[in-house]
UniProtKB/Swiss-Prot annotation:
UniProt cross-references to NCBIfam families, sorted A to Z: dnlj (TIGR00575), PRK07956.1 (NF005932)
Protein family per UniProt: Belongs to the NAD-dependent DNA ligase family. LigA subfamily.
InterPro entries hit by this protein: BRCT_dom (IPR001357), BRCT_dom_sf (IPR036420), DisA/LigA_HHH (IPR041663), DNA_ligase (IPR001679), DNA_ligase_AS (IPR018239), DNA_ligase_CS (IPR033136), DNAligase_adenylation (IPR013839), DNAligase_N (IPR013840)
Function: DNA ligase that catalyzes the formation of phosphodiester linkages between 5'-phosphoryl and 3'-hydroxyl groups in double-stranded DNA using NAD as a coenzyme and as the energy source for the reaction. It is essential for DNA replication and repair of damaged DNA.
Listed GO CC annotations: cytosol
Residue sites binding Zn(2+) per the record: 439, 442, 458, 464
Lineage, highest ranks first: Bacteria, Bacillati, Actinomycetota, Actinomycetes, Micrococcales
Protein name: DNA ligase 1
Active site, UniProt feature: 144 (n6-amp-lysine intermediate)
Stored Pfam families: BRCT, DNA_ligase_aden, DNA_ligase_OB, DNA_ligase_ZBD, HHH_2
Membrane spanning residue stretches: none
Length: 770
């Protein structure tokens, strides 16, 4: 997946440049922004945590770039939890979480030679301003391996830990599995290695080895693996290292993170040292000074990409000199000294067999294409979203068409359009897609939520099984109750099983009342496989219980037992997670935290007036109205009441001993603080009544700047906003504005009141829990 697969070394932070003319976002823009944020988080989770992409790189990149475009025009929408402010995915709960000594960054992506040249122009202009104005760059140019980013930690030459990248700050401890990869030395060789060093690289499965491994799986009657990247990621997440050892994994290292006592001056010099220490370094890199040579490198490997040792999804271009890298610095997500060029997407032709629709958790109806399975860019694709009926019309596709399917960036499927020259040759003849007028799941008439909406929705939130399935899947997510055993297939089994006729759940209200006996007879339809290959035939299989025999009676599976343990654990989740789990439109993690902080109890939130809700910083009128509308429904209140009766915690334990020193203040933290992680700093602000913002504006009270602070610090200085270091931040936390010499802020005299319009804009920055 793009916008996050490459890694970068060194440390610093900043914020993306905000370009374009600012204006108040319309309701349509706000809704588009919320939907985009929701989709991108969903697709990232599937890619990084499940190793099972739901969409192609092309579609993901398009969605991500549109999100960046909206944020550039409306910077007030940017929140700390925006996908543009995050790196990759979170650490999985299945492995111990470990913090990297130095953050692992993403890379900025460009998708054409024109975009690359524009990036090079900007970088070269910045480099020319350094020193005496005559500096020039040498570019280390290398292949972008399509694998899993891994961080190796060596102490005194001994490998002591290996971790996935995770969110860039915290990854998963996969040391035991990495030890099975023969190319990775457990003890560095040679001399001169640092007493402590993080080595970054990419674990992958060579293309030929992947094909041979899949052939062996099929011969053994097992399902083949989807593609080398997902296979490598899945191999490193095996609970049994012996299983990992069976996979043909390799690794190439491409940089370093934290280190003690290393005097390397450049990326290429570091590669030479890594090789001397016995680490596997890719042979596919060159240090180039002329731009024409960089473009020649791209052209050369573009022609050879399917003949290489491993799959690639682009070319990485880095400034070779470390001093120049440090001078150029970082944004919050990417280095300014490196870029990933993505090759034009591979395209294939396949038949569009049907266009079906899916009903989401807020009733939104989305068409998607079902195609003859076809292999493109290393994986088999048979589905691709078509977003809405207007997109279907704009693409001009008809059911039965031969269509152009591509994977831009080499990883999410996109239907580009029909092959018109073949349309008249199709048998049976092609036919138009007609958007249904009734919900395919419950039969309720469909309609736009309001006049002029492109999307149509099913208004039957209470009884629509598709909406219930999607809500149950959502509430179990990492932002909600975090129930790992309640995945997509389990949500289907609970809400839409093949048997019995009445599902275990007809409302999420009953979730915490489930018993093992309720699940004993549940069966789902699962496709039969022959030697690992799908047959197109289906059978009914028990989902929550094992198949019983005369000698071994049916009993709950290990996954079922895990589900009940996690349901019990979920009851003690904090209030904000319960709010997220309720699928209230517009109420995402940011608003939920603000509401929990302001009211402390679910009863307090329910009883609050719309005006009181809107007054909460980070909520505003849109979210306040959505809350009142949601609680006005009897069946919604029943969910809360039954969860509470089952023991779900509906209030937060409030530490009254923590002084509310930041009441009414907005604080922005930028750069690296020695004694606070970003989350710790945010939590310290919130518990003292302040707002932890991700962007600097005239309404910002203070900016806390750590090492390598970026453009947020520049903007604070331009606006005349007080800037504090970590010591000043501690004083502010303990004693409020007066402790740092700001009497006016302490009195509240100069604090501007927020207009209704400003609160409305804040509401739009919250992801739609839809």
């Amino acid at each position: 997946m793009s916008t996050g697969e490459g890694t970068a070394e060194q440390t610093a932070t900043g914020t993306p440049a905000q370009n374009g003319r600012e204006s108040i976002p319309s309701d349509a823009i706000r809704e588009e922004y919320e939907n985009l944020s929701d989709l991108i988080r969903k697709y990232r989770f599937a890619y990084y945590q499940d190793d099972a992409p739901l969409v192609s790189d092309a579609e993901f990149d398009t969605l991500f770039r549109r999100l960046e475009e909206i944020e550039a025009l409306h910077p007030e929408l940017v929140a700390n939890d925006s996908p543009t402010q995050e790196v990759g995915g979170e650490a999985s709960a299945a492995f111990a979480a470990v913090e990297h000594l130095q953050r692992m960054y993403s890379l900025e992506d460009v998708f054409s030679i024109e975009e690359l040249e524009a990036w090079l122009n900007r970088a070269e202009a910045s480099i020319a301003k350094l020193g005496d104005g005559t500096a020039q760059a040498a570019w280390l140019t290398e292949l972008k391996i399509d694998g899993l980013a891994v961080n190796l930690l060596y102490r005194d030459g001994k490998l002591v830990r290996a971790a996935t990248r995770g969110d860039g700050t915290t990854g998963e401890d996969i040391t035991h599995n990495v030890l099975t990869i023969k190319e990775i030395p457990q003890q560095l060789s040679g001399e001169g290695y640092p007493s402590e060093v993080e080595v970054r690289g990419e674990v992958f499965i060579p293309s030929k080895a992947f094909a041979e491994f899949n052939e062996a799986l099929i011969e053994a009657g097992k399902a083949p693996l989807a593609n080398p990247r997902n296979a490598a990621a899945g191999s490193l997440r095996q609970k049994d290292p012996a299983e990992t050892a069976k996979r043909p994994l390799k690794m190439f290292v491409h940089g370093i993170g934290a280190r003690e006592g290393l005097e390397a001056r450049s990326q290429s010099e570091t590669y030479a040292l890594l090789k001397e220490w016995g680490l596997p370094v890719s042979p596919y890199f060159e240090v180039l000074e002329a731009r024409a040579d960089v473009l020649g490198f791209i052209s050369k490997y573009g022609e050879q990409r399917h003949k290489l040792l491993h799959e690639i999804d682009g070319i990485v271009i880095k400034v070779d000199d470390f001093a120049t890298q440090r001078a150029l610095g970082y944004t919050t997500r990417v280095p300014r000294w490196a870029v990933a060029y993505k090759y034009p997407p591979e395209e294939v032709h396949t038949k569009l067999l049907d266009i079906q629709v899916n009903v989401g958790r807020t009733g939104r109806v989305t068409p998607f294409g079902m195609m003859e399975p076809v292999k493109v860019a290393g994986s088999t694709v048979e589905m691709a979203t078509l977003h809405n009926q207007d997109v279907v019309k704009a693409k001009g596709v008809k059911i039965g068409d031969i269509v152009v399917l591509r994977k831009a960036g080499d990883v999410i499927p996109e239907i580009v359009g029909p092959v018109l020259a073949l349309r008249d040759q199709q048998d049976p003849p092609v036919r138009d897609f007609v958007m249904p007028t009734e919900c395919p799941a419950c039969g309720t008439p469909l309609a736009p939520a309001k006049e002029g909406d492109v999307d149509i929705r099913c208004p039957n939130g209470k009884s629509c099984p598709s909406q219930l399935r999607e809500r149950v899947f959502h509430l179990a997510g990492r932002g909600g109750f975090d129930i790992e055993a309640l995945g997509w297939e389990a949500a289907i089994a609970l809400t839409q099983p093949a048997e019995p006729d009445v599902p275990p759940l007809t409302s999420e209200a009953a979730l915490f009342d489930l018993t093992r006996e309720d699940l004993a007879d549940v069966k789902i339809r699962r496709e039969k496989r022959s030697k690992g290959v799908a047959t197109g035939e289906y059978e009914l299989v028990p989902y929550f219980y094992s198949k019983g025999t005369a000698k071994s009676p049916s009993k709950p599976t290990a996954s079922t037992e895990k589900l009940f343990k996690e349901l019990d654990k979920a009851k003690s989740q904090p209030l904000w997670r319960v709010l997220v789990a309720l699928s209230i439109r517009h109420v995402g993690p940011r608003a939920s935290r603000a509401l929990a902080q302001a009211f402390g109890t679910m009863d307090g939130i329910r009883a609050a007036s719309e005006e009181e809700l809107a007054h909460v910083d980070g909520v505003g009128p849109t979210i306040a109205a959505a809350l009142k509308e949601w609680f006005a429904e009897d069946w919604h209140r029943e969910i809360v009441d039954r969860w509470a009766a089952a023991g779900v915690r509906m209030e937060d334990e409030r530490d009254e001993s923590t002084p509310r020193t930041l009441e009414g203040l907005t604080v922005v933290v930028t750069g690296s603080l020695p004694n606070f992680s970003r989350d710790e700093a945010k939590e310290a602000i919130l518990v003292r009544g302040g707002k932890a913002s991700g962007s600097v504006s005239k309404n910002t009270s203070y900016v806390v700047a750590g090492e390598s602070a970026g453009t947020k610090l520049d903007k604070a200085e331009q606006l005349g906003i007080r800037v504090l270091d970590e010591d000043g931040f501690r004083l502010l936390l303990d004693g409020g504005p007066a402790a740092v010499g700001d009497a006016a802020e302490a009195d509240g005299g100069d604090a501007p009141e927020e207009s209704a319009a400003l609160q409305e804009e804040k509401a739009a920055a919250v992801e739609e829990t839809a």
